């Protein structure tokens, strides 16, 4: 058993008509992982588990395998992403109740220029292929400044 700070991210494809399109969101706490991984990334950085989570061994963050778009087939804004986090905490997704949106810094750790995956439109995104194809191309984050929320993109431009 390893005790680790887990960060569960929901790659949530989001869309705000007034602002921008986004596609991911996440969550944090300290829990124990009891199971063995069912799959490991080619560089051994990520481990996938049967409960629908992916562990980043470098950052000790745990992410949800599927994003909001993949699970709900719907667009969400930042407020809806936060409401969804509450719902999955209430349901104790994967046995955890401390999910949250990632910070900009945390979400940025998923972007790796040498990694390849495809988003819901079949376009190239730069996250590990252990994450299922068809996800969104960016993520909502917990970071805010006045009335603005920050997004991290996984497309060519990468980052914030």
Language-model features: locations:
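Glycine-aromatic-enriched surface loops/turns that form tight recognition elements
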Residues: 2-7, 15, 19-100, 104-160
